[in-house]
Amino acid sequence: MKTKRYFCEKFNFMKFVKNTVLFFLTFSLFIQCKKEIQPETKSGVKNEITYAKGLEIYKYEGYTIVKITKPWPEAKENFIYVLQEKNGIIPDSLKRLTIVPIPLQSIVVTSTTHIPALEMLGVENTLVGFPNTDYISSEKTRKLIDVGKVREVGTNETLNTEVLIDMAPDLIVSFGLNNNNPTIDNLQKSGLKVIYNGDWTEQSPLGKAEWIKFFGALYGLDNKANTIFKEIEKEYTNTLA
């Protein structure tokens, strides 16, 4: 009986050890898989934005994550986009998001506040459409309008979906007053890429100015955008001194 009890206890102990090992192996694999599907939490990646409250930019090898946290006042939802460089590999966990290949070759913007950033970066020639072009007063961009390089695309409230689909720009940069924007929904359903820009919600001058980094990221001109913003920051600081 003692011998039988001994073997039974030994068998139960070995079974316990085996189950314990299997548990830790399974747990280890679970943790490893969890890390693999959350690459955006890599350590050491910092937000490139300092002053703007509604914008975050995180740069990774081969792609950039742009997060719009305040596209309109009282916004409850964040909008996250992935800017994919040529041959850049996007993690599976990010493929459900809007992916925009960069650098852009054509763009439609919807606010006159977007025009100066394009001109400072030297990419105004990529502008192919704008709502209410009569509102644009910039000499550089007006020349593009006058020669027919920038098309009229309706109004902000009712963008001309048919014209935009025909143009097929790489990206439409829009803005919203709230989360009810059926025109934007229709454009996205048509396969067009749309990104919200919330520069108009910023309360500080430097916060508004820092959105040039948003456009810099779209064109792969991050360094140029940073240099321009540093000059703006310096001039603003000197003015206050």
Each PLM stretch: what is its role?
Residues 1-40:
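Bacterial Sec-dependent N-terminal signal peptides
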Residues 12, 97, 143-144, 166, ...:
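Generic signal for short, ordered secondary-structure residues
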Residues 33-115, 224-241:
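Bacterial Sec-exported substrate-binding components of ABC uptake systems
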Residues 44-53, 157-159, 197-201:
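Short N-terminal helix-initiation segments at or just after the protein's N-terminus
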Residues 64, 72-165, 171-178:
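A short, structured surface patch at a secondary-structure boundary
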Residues 106, 149, 166-175, 180-241:
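Extracytoplasmic substrate-binding proteins
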